[in-house]
Amino acid sequence: MLYHKEVNWEKRFDYALNYLIKRDMELTEHLWQHLITKDKPKYDIDYNKLISICKNVYAHKQPHLYVFEVATDDNTGMIIKACFRTNYDHKRDISIVVKDGVIITAWLNHYKDKHINLNKEKYLK
């Protein structure tokens, strides 16, 4: 099931990254392609900075960390995927999707973008 911080949230979801972030993260081919081609401004992400952010999250040293979306296993209720947002630079935040030690995707947003066009229908209520 899919949950969003603005729709339906359980306190345990705030700790999702404790289960999903690993010391050595892998990247999907999908994300690698975006990092290599930088085909859109939102993918203008420095690989080393991305890995550094994930290592800081793993070490509980990343400031301004905001977990905003979580997926759970339909049968067990265990957290299987999480999306979080944190500072990237003075103008942008980065959102990162992780699952079992793998960075599925990541993108940049202006730090003031609050995602007001959220589609609440796709989240459990």
Q: What do these predicted ranges mean?
A:
Residues M1-K125:
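Ribonuclease/tRNase effector modules and their secretory precursors
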